[in-house]
Amino acid sequence: MADSSCSLPPLYENISYKSYILRAVDLTILGLLFSLLLHRILYMSQNGIIWLVAFLCESCFSFVWLLSTCTKWSPAETKPYPDRLDERVYDLPSVDMFVPTADPVREPPIMVVNTVLSLLAVNYPANKLACYVSDDGCSPLTYFSLKEASKFAKIWVPFCKKYNLKVRAPFRYFLNPFAATEGSEFSRDWEMTKREYEKLCRKVEDATGDSHLLGTDNELEAFSNTKPNDHSTIIKVVWENKGGVGDEKEVPHIVYISREKRPNYLHHYKAGAMNFLARVSGLMTNAPYMLNVDCDMYANEADVVRQAMCIFLQKSQNQNHCAFVQFPQEFYDSNTIKLTVIKSYMGRGIAGIQGPINVGSGCFHSRRVMYGLSPDELEDNGSLSSVATRELLAEDSLSSGFGNSKEMVTSVVEALQRKPNPQNILTNSIEAAQEVGHCDYESQTSWGKTIGWLYDSMSEDMNTSIGIHSRGWTSSYIAPDPPAFLGSMPPGGLEAMIQQRRWATGSIEVLFNKQSPLLGLFCRKLRFRQRVAYLCVSICVRSIPELIYCLLPAYCLLHNSALFPKGLCLGITMLLAGMHCLYTLWEFMCLGHSIQSWYVSQSFWRIVATSSWLFSIFDIILKLLGLSKNVFLVSKKTMPVETMSGSGIGPSQREDDGPNSGKTEFDGSLYFLPGTFIVLVNLAALVGVFVGLQRSSYSHGGGGSGLGEACACILVVMLFFPFLKGLFAKGKYGIPLSTLSKAGFLAVSFVVFSVGN
């Protein structure tokens, strides 16, 4: 409970950033884009179909820049003051922490364990925390790893709090070199903790290779004869905190759950798992706030829970309207700078409107909001209004919305009325929790429709976020230093493509479902610029113009026709390209990144736009035609590994270190066909200029191709440089012959068409 005294300093402040210079640059680039479009229109008749195609592509790029400028116009973020929490709040609220995982092969259990351990060790009373791990793969290995981790947690959690460690994920902490006086108490504790962690790693690794090492425990009988897509509900209380006083030696609750799955029932992927987590946690601990963290995103800031509570516990009108607190999704991999930079600027921009978008991890939710509550149904003090009490708490309304479980309905009423949750014995709730995990429990209810995480999209985070903002809620954005959560991304190649395809498919799905920001035009509670922001992050459909624009310079060189204006008007194009390059480079350098990182990022987004995003459009078309159903593809996760030494103290080795670090791995997947085709076409066009393969004449008055088109071809090849290297590399870093053959056939066809058309 919080002290409402107004004389005390606030728990947080909202910081707005205004840069009139950047706004001027954004508008200047937008003006240059419109000038180029106007020039295209005025001289369209003289240049024919090529300029029409270029005009359509550039119109799309201009629209995207307009959306981006509108989104970034008023950046903001929230700065919490967790040090003030103790003097303002004498009884901190409980928090339920969710860690979903789906595949023990693609999401290694030791990585899940590290995420769980980092959450258990945060600076927050242990009796106020509960960690729930949802295993959609129903893997006995995941349960075994979690059980072994609970034993190590009794060593790790006190060690972290005793020495106030900054990094509380063991695998990251022990990657750092040991620095302490030999023989000191810290040195002895460090060595002992290191040895125990190595034992944990070996147990998990050995059990991964030999299932017999999982043991013959009666608890594992529940996993017999189970399949990932066909099994009953399994709920195990791995560790129950019975101390109840929250001292530094206590370990929070740890609960393993795996919902029932049957082949003939939809399980709605991650969104379905999150809703099951909400129901089970509601029955067991019913904390007023919920944190969801992906299994590869560990807590990197020990005060992260306290920082979020600063937002929720500030007694103000704004506090009552804050639905969730989002921390940015950041990564420890060097190959993810391209994502971090975009999210830094776009995240702060959206935060300055109605609040950040839920990105699916590192997000603290209010349970009442996830249960469908709207701001209009609250009094100024945060309690339910009389009208809401009659409508929401009616027995018929509760059963039709939340299901027929009486225990579930009771927990919902307590959550909506903000009643304190007593310390219950977790095992007493297992039977009721298993009931709400049945495949058909959500049938004829509002779960996934207006309650919990919303269905009908693979991007359940964005879908749910739009639903929350459409009800009039706001959200808060906190970007602490160091980052609150850190994770890993696929190192490159196929896995990165798969992940980007899933994200793109989900974001496009949102445009065509009931939560579409386009439909939000009829919802006054979703602000106009917030709708623009959602459109901006959903605009992966620009992949088709991106692909066409990468081929236009080559076509114009081979066809001997002009793509860019001539004379003084060429200055518009040159100034536009130069300003855009310098502007994006400045964004990178302001965040401390290098020119090389900027170049890699530009290359990455061009490759993704013409491959993963392109396939996502086909996914959506097939889904809309009813010819296919989208499948949630789990990308493979990796983590740094240690070089174990005899003493347990020694240098560590990352699995991505070495001469091949940063190289793209290729295989015969269709993901690599567009990029290979683009490189071959542009190389053929450049070679064609020197060997006289160009058409000898042109039919329009706009003139023939020239230096501008040749430079554009060179730029495209540079942006697709990983594919250029792949043409000459061998092994997994070389493009397979099957892909080269397909791309070569398409490239030859393109050249023949361009020259002969």
UniProtKB/Swiss-Prot annotation:
Upper taxonomic lineage: Eukaryota, Viridiplantae, Streptophyta, Embryophyta, Tracheophyta
One record GO biological process: cell wall organization
Name of the protein in question: Cellulose synthase-like protein B2
Keyword Transmembrane (UniProt): yes
UniProt cross-references to PANTHER family, sorted A to Z: X-BOX TRANSCRIPTION FACTOR-RELATED
Membrane topology: Multi-pass membrane protein
Subcellular location per the Swiss-Prot or TrEMBL entry: Golgi apparatus membrane
Gene Ontology CC terms: Golgi membrane
Entry function: Thought to be a Golgi-localized beta-glycan synthase that polymerize the backbones of noncellulosic polysaccharides (hemicelluloses) of plant cell wall.
A GO MF term: cellulose synthase (UDP-forming) activity
Stretch forming the signal peptide: none
Tissue expr: Expressed in young seedlings, primarily in the root vascular tissue.
Transmembrane segments: 24-44, 48-68, 533-555, 568-588, 607-627, 672-692, 704-724, 735-755
Top EC group: transferase
Family named by the database record: Belongs to the glycosyltransferase 2 family. Plant cellulose synthase-like B subfamily.
Gene: CSLB2
